[in-house]
Amino acid sequence: MKIIALCCSLLVAATGLVRGATPVWPTFRGPNCSGVAADAKPPVKIGPTNAVLWKVPLPFSPSSPCIWGDRLFVTAFENNELQTRCYQRADGKLAWSRGVTVEELETFHRTESSPVASTPVTDGERVVTYFGSFGLICHDMQGTELWRHPLPMALSFGGYGTSTSPLISGNLVVVMRDRDEASSLLAVDLITGKKVWETARPDSFGSFGTPILWNNHGVAEVVVPGPLRLKGYELATGRENWVVEGITACACTTPVEGNGLLYFAAWSDGKADDPWATWEELLGKHDHNKDGVLSLDEFEEISRDYYRGFDVNRDGTVEKSDYDLLLASITKGENVLLAIEPGGRGNITQSHVAWKSTRGLPYVASPLLYDGRLYCFKNGGMISSFDAQTGKAFYLQERLNAEGYYYSSPVAADGRLYVASLPGKLTVIKAGGDQPEILHQVEFGERIHSSPAIAGTNLYLRTQSALYAFGEPAGR
């Protein structure tokens, strides 16, 4: 009976089905991280001075909003607290804020991340937040703490900081704990917070995507991106069921599923089209004392955390052997978009890849599956559209007049795609077609790392300094 319940929960999460008409966007990118709000109708012409229902100041974090009914949840780091905040969707008023403090914060990128980068997840009765410096903490919808599950500090690759978000299925909370050492996939009981299972991921030195749920021929699975490998684990037990090898070495995106297939797309530097510096070039730039070894204090402060991840043996220096080992790992994988068929067990790299593409690949922005098409947004402001079943490209790397990196992942509703560039330009695109049709573009005047959230007739967007709610005022 428990397995049946878990499979039913998986179906609900994957399709976005909810009781009645309660607006639900329960986690990062909404139902099962899909980015799709099937029945929502948010406005098109939104912006910092247009269709704004409310706006509240919010400390910077790449974390995105999640929604259940009249409640909206976000994270914030303020007054040395790792905070879970609850806002009223109707007017933006703060309903409650609960924080935890730690003796030491995880290492994180000072301009591109924060110690509260993970998006909360809710089932309508509880909200669970993951902090890399603390672990998991659960509150009810009124802010009462129900349990906490402390964990060892996350040690992210390159010192970027934690970005993965937890998921809920049935009575399980699942979180990926890919670290520089002792990586694992962890499941705890939603009611008690106690560990149910934990599966080691010894070949995963760090990744930044979020796991999703997949009904793989009747088996409820957790699909987890990682360096060089995409894996599927049995939800009930944590057992590894299958692996696809040869993907990019630095997985920053989240998979999506639908149309009977599973999709993953990612890109990272270090390949022939964007090679890393040679060891000699790195020494020439940073080896100020000319000793042939790079100590961390020889790097500029803003890049020190990044290069700390290159110190493989943890002796406080980066040596040629460290760098060569990382370079060899980075160059192994392929920057690729994959469509994976269900039913496989073991290594399915050769047997269950339905189609693949190596163009138009995203770096951080996850792919979007919508109305039979798969969309990818490449850094520089380029969109590609593929037939989700066959992989045929309707168009490739078409420019959107919105340059820059894309850390925010696209979302879709009512026949439209919404995507924001890191410099702060939001673009609304008509879904479908042989060419992208831009319906609206607007500059926010500040950077956007977070992904939009959609509920009913509203769209919510977190910028560098604020949280916006967009929609038409009541009575119009």
Where are these regions (language model features)?
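Bacterial N-terminal signal peptides
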Residues: A5-G16
